[in-house]
């Protein structure tokens, strides 16, 4: 049987449900697919299928994530849901499934809880740009003023972490009532679900496609071609490249080399242009083979700089996940795998009051590399020691 072709007729947007355990994230995900299945825009995925999320690996870390897809009249959505709190943290830090917007689920019976706050903080740090709130289980609260109070608390919480708390759409409803409702899409139990989908369509803008961002390609390999010059190969991370374009070679020192790409090739054929996602070779004008190496990046002039020091949120693998068996302190020196660069770095700063970091923790720390690498906020990386992954991180702030 031939694979079904993915037809791009509607803009594609990645979303996910976040929030405290048992506040109804998976039930809401099920309710969305049920409602849209009645309109012929999705396949219904029941709660028990969402809850037993399959395992996947990202940067050497195992994460349980459920992916569902559905459409509205306007868009195609890929929606992620994680069963466990640790899975959310690992997903956000590794960027296994990136989100253009998040649906924060808060139970009206509880209001914001510790994990609510933690998920919002992480969403801010990894730059999830838009947030929509679904106040769930409203059928279990008799006094509407209590729901108003929960809404105020959630708006305050979002504002605290840099989201526009006053503007964020807040929808009230019961995901369970929608899941249990009859199969008539006009039934009133589905109204909040439709409101939520309208908010997603209208409040989360179409994401900027990777191909429209400034060009960047991590260098994987370098070859010398007699009579032609030096070729660097890699997978284009973002943007586009055409013969004649000026680029910079960045990383491994503070010196930035400028050059021109004279030819772009894929499978030994010359291309008019390489775009995000393509594996290409770029022929560089006037660059010797020993002037460029794996771990550097080729980038649009002025778009990224080399740095040694940065702050990052790091998830430290548990022993059971193949991580360290013992805690570490300031001064710990593992390897950092940043794009194609593999560089030693030192933990030079931990949060106030944190003396040691235990396997299973996630902590913001300051890192100093032994040489500069092309780094920017939101950059994901792996932490390795003795040939095994011991952690995963995301850059939250570049220092120098």
From Swiss-Prot:
Residues 60-64 are annotated as: G2. The keyword Protein biosynthesis applies. Its EC number is 3.6.5.3. Residues 10-208 form the tr-type G domain. GTP binds at residues 19-26, 81-85, 136-139. Pfam families: GTP_EFTU (PF00009), GTP_EFTU_D2 (PF03144), GTP_EFTU_D3 (PF03143). Residues 81-84 are annotated as: G3. It catalyses: GTP + H2O = GDP + phosphate + H(+). Residues 19-26 are annotated as: G1. InterPro entries: EF-Tu_GTP-bd, EF-Tu_GTPase, EFTu-like_2, EFTU_2, G_TR_CS, P-loop_NTPase, Small_GTP-bd, T_Tr_GTP-bd_dom. Keywords: Cytoplasm, Elongation factor, GTP-binding, Hydrolase, Magnesium, Metal-binding, Nucleotide-binding, Protein biosynthesis. GO terms for cellular component: cytoplasm. It is found in: Cytoplasm. NCBIfam families: EF-Tu, PRK00049.1, PRK12735.1, PRK12736.1, small_GTP. GTP hydrolase that promotes the GTP-dependent binding of aminoacyl-tRNA to the A-site of ribosomes during protein biosynthesis. This is Elongation factor Tu. It comes from Thermotoga maritima (strain ATCC 43589 / DSM 3109 / JCM 10099 / NBRC 100826 / MSB8). The gene is tuf.
């Amino acid at each position: 049987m031939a694979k079904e072709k993915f037809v791009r007729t509607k803009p594609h947007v990645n979303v996910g449900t976040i929030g405290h355990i048992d506040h109804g994230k998976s039930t809401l995900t099920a309710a969305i697919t049920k409602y849209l299945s009645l309109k012929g825009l999705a396949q219904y995925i029941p709660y028990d299928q969402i809850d037993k999320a399959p395992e996947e690996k990202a940067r050497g870390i195992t994460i349980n994530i459920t992916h569902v897809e559905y459409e509205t009249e306007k868009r195609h959505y890929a929606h992620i849901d994680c069963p466990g709190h640790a899975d959310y943290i690992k997903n956000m830090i590794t960027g296994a499934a990136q989100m253009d917007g998040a649906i924060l689920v808060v139970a009206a019976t509880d209001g914001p809880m510790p994990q609510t706050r933690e998920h919002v903080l992480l969403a801010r740090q990894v730059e999830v740009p838009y947030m929509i709130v679904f106040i769930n289980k409203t059928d279990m609260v008799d006094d509407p003023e209590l729901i108003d109070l929960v809404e105020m608390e959630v708006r305050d919480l979002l504002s605290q972490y840099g989201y526009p708390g006053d503007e964020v759409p807040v929808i009230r409803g019961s995901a369970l009532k929608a899941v249990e409702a009859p199969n008539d899409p006009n039934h009133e139990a589905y109204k909040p679900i439709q409101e939520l989908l309208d908010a997603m369509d209208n409040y989360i803008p179409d994401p900027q496609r990777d191909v429209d961002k400034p060009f960047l390609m991590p260098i994987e390999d370098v070859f010398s071609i007699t009579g032609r010059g030096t070729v660097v190969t890699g997978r284009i991370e973002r943007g586009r490249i055409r013969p004649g374009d000026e680029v910079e070679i960045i990383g491994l020192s503070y010196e930035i080399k400028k050059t021109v790409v004279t030819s772009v090739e894929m499978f030994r054929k010359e291309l008019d242009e390489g775009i995000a996602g393509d594996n290409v070779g770029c022929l560089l004008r006037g660059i010797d083979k020993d002037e460029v190496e794996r771990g550097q990046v080729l980038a649009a002039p002025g778009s990224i700089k080399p740095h040694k020091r940065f702050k990052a949120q790091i998830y430290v693998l548990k022993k059971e996940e193949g991580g360290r068996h013992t805690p570490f302190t300031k001064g710990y020196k593992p390897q950092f795998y940043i794009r194609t660069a593999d560089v030693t770095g030192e933990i030079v700063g931990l949060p106030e009051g944190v003396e040691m970091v235990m396997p299973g923790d996630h902590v913001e720390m300051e890192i100093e590399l032994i040489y500069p690498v092309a780094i920017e906020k939101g950059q994901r990386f792996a932490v390795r020691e003795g040939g095994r992954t011991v952690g995963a991180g995301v850059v939250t702030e570049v220092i120098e």
